[in-house]
């Protein structure tokens, strides 16, 4: 563990490091971050523990690379959707797509999402990554809507508030399952609330 961490340059070494990160992604998703150790990650990746420590200082170091994968895979569709918006913006249709996408992301990445979000409260680097992602998406939407001629007072604040609503609803829809809630009706309320934030 005391050996120097190296950045792989050869194709075989890069592939080996990627296998370790993928193994970490799978194990953190399946059994959680705290229930996984580097020996298990090494075994899943088909390498020795020494190889793991050649590329990563510790398990947390692997987690930060796992977070990069999660962010790219989970949020790329949202950013693509934003980039493809055209004027005049159909907020009802767009927000419907955003809600569907958010629900699907939370379903697909349920375990890793839970693991990473629980760590965001105790790990500064993880928390900073999520804040950076929030900033990137908020500003990307604000810039795109401004380019498309959307003129709303406090646009950035509206977008950030909308993102909080989408996140909260997705958690409720995918994870919480209150028996007294009609989630289809709740989805309509959320969509109408969000449309009212942006539509004239």
Predicted region positions:
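N-terminal intrinsically disordered/low-complexity leader segments
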Residues: 1-15
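Helix-turn-helix
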Residues: 15, 19, 23, 27-61, ...
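Alpha-helical DNA-contacting segments of helix-turn-helix folds
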Residues: 40, 64-70, 120, 129, ...
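Hydrophobic alpha-helical connector segments
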Residues: 65, 80-108, 149-152, 162
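Amphipathic alpha-helical segments used for helix-helix packing
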Residues: 82-84, 93, 103-125, 171-176
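Hydrophobic/aromatic-rich alpha-helical bundle segments in the mid-to-C-terminal region
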Residues: 114-116, 127, 146-193
């Amino acid at each position: 563990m005391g050996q120097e961490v190296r950045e792989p340059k050869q194709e075989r070494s890069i592939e080996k490091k990627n296998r370790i990160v993928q193994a970490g992604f799978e194990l953190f998703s399946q059994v959680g971050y705290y229930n996984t150790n580097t020996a298990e990650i090494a075994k899943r990746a088909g390498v020795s523990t020494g190889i793991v420590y050649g590329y990563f200082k510790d398990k947390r170091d692997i987690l930060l690379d796992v977070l990069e994968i999660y962010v790219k895979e989970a949020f790329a569709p949202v950013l693509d959707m934003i980039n493809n918006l055209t004027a005049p913006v159909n907020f009802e249709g767009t927000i419907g797509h955003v809600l569907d996408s958010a629900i699907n992301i939370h379903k697909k990445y349920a375990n890793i999402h839970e693991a990473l979000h629980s760590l965001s409260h105790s790990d500064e680097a993880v928390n900073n990554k999520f804040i950076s992602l929030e900033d990137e998406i908020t500003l990307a939407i604000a810039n795109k809507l401004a380019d498309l001629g959307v003129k709303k007072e406090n646009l950035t604040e509206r977008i950030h508030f909308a993102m909080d609503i989408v996140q909260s609803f997705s958690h409720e829809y995918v994870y919480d399952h209150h028996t007294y809630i009609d989630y289809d009706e709740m989805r309509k309320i959320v969509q109408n609330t969000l449309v009212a934030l942006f539509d004239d």
